[in-house]
Amino acid sequence: MDRIRIVGGNELHGVIPISGAKNAALPLMIASLLTDDTLTLENVPHLADVEQLIRILGNHGADISVNGRRERQGESYARTVHFTSRNIVSTTAPYELVSKMRASFWVIGPLLAREGRARVSLPGGCAIGTRPVDLFIEGLTALGASIEIDGGYVNATAPAGGLIGGRYTFPKVSVGATHVLMMAATLANGTTVLGNAAREPEVVDLAKCLNAMGAKISGQGTSTITIEGVRSLSGARHRVLPDRIETGTYAMAVAMAGGDVILEDTEASLLDTALEAIRRAGAEISDTNNGIRIVRNGAGIRPVDIVTDPFPGFPTDLQAQFMGLMTRSSGVSHITETIFENRFMHVQELARLGAKISLSGQTAKVEGVSRLKGAPVMATDLRASVSLVIAGLAAEGETMVSRVYHLDRGFERLEEKLTRCGAHVERVSD
């Protein structure tokens, strides 16, 4: 099993290309099930979760082709992937596939809308709290679906004439449920209005792609999304937006290690709140022609309190990384997690490096220390794993991170991108 070895102490200098967003690519790939035409996606990252979803879509009958594992585009790498779901051969998403990745549950929306039925296993993925599927079920029921859960599967059936447009207000903001209902509603009869919808850039990106396919969606980026159903969708060509979580992660890595790095092929507007927190921590951040420049030279890391919130608030997917940064601050910071329960599993591993963190409910109190010391640590989930890498960049000596398959789910060529900027990071095999 692979591990990541980090020898701390090196500043970061250079250019890091930002990949396409995993959290945007996954729903875009699933949207290909809505049409019998070809959907072409550019800037698709090469990640374990993407490869797993390709297998799942193939199970449903999608024909998938990749133009070049690495297509050189300036200083970045990207893939162009073509999806053609001319014939849906199965409306069942089995446990052995869905259990490996939560987002694969989202196929329930397109399958139900296009085929009138779906049988989808309850999901897997990162073990962060309960992450219930109640909102998906309630929302699809509001569109006329009949749903029952039996033997670990969600069995959904549309009315004889197809799904029916309706109104549904999410009791809490859910990005995944917003994706699913928006996709399902594109082929429903009549108009659907989603209230308290997620406003994340990935939702806006999905709506942009669906509209290019012939959908009639408005209000994306606000808390009320309106979808006027159409009879069918066509193919389209769409470029996946930059990964704001990867952008924020590398910005925090520079703030932690010190240095001067340009993050290319990304946009500051995708993560304003997170970048402001990094500025307050002591980094200088400025826009470039094609990205963002992060500088921290000499100045220490200042303590900053943050609370995770749905977009445009501080992203929960950057909470662990920011905690890693705060372990070296010059004071006390408080990090409150409001999106997911049980998302502090990285705390005890950071403590192995010398961090001083105490928990009280959904808030972590981080007392900055003057030095961290390398140690063997274990990744517990995707975002927690990269927080250990960030801490390792500033730790004295060697940090060895095990269970790095978590990293491979969401970070494309992480060790390569850090190494090209001067970090001592390498993948080793047992």
UniProtKB/Swiss-Prot annotation:
E.C. number: 2.5.1.7
Binding site for UDP-N-acetyl-alpha-D-glucosamine: 102, 131-135, 172-175, 317, 339
Database matches in InterPro entries: Enolpyruvate_Tfrase_dom, Enolpyruvate_Tfrase_sf, MurA_subfamily, RNA3'P_cycl/enolpyr_Trfase_a/b, UDP_GlcNAc_COvinyl_MurA
Catalytic residue list: 126
Pathway(s): Cell wall biogenesis; peptidoglycan biosynthesis
Disulphide bridges, residue numbers: none
Subcellular location: Cytoplasm
Catalytic activity: phosphoenolpyruvate + UDP-N-acetyl-alpha-D-glucosamine = UDP-N-acetyl-3-O-(1-carboxyvinyl)-alpha-D-glucosamine + phosphate
Positions where 2-(S-cysteinyl)pyruvic acid O-phosphothioketal occurs in the chain: 126
GO biological process: cell division; cell wall organization; peptidoglycan biosynthetic process; regulation of cell shape; UDP-N-acetylgalactosamine biosynthetic process
Single GO MF annotation: UDP-N-acetylglucosamine 1-carboxyvinyltransferase activity
Keywords (A to Z) from UniProt: Cell cycle, Cell division, Cell shape, Cell wall biogenesis/degradation, Cytoplasm, Peptidoglycan synthesis, Pyruvate, Transferase
GO CC aspect terms: cytoplasm
Matches recorded under SUPFAM superfamilies: EPT/RTPC-like
Leader sequence segment: none
Enzyme class, first EC level, given as a word: transferase
Family under the similarity heading: Belongs to the EPSP synthase family. MurA subfamily.
Functional summary from the UniProt entry: Cell wall formation. Adds enolpyruvyl to UDP-N-acetylglucosamine.
Record protein name field: UDP-N-acetylglucosamine 1-carboxyvinyltransferase
Organism: Sinorhizobium medicae (strain WSM419)
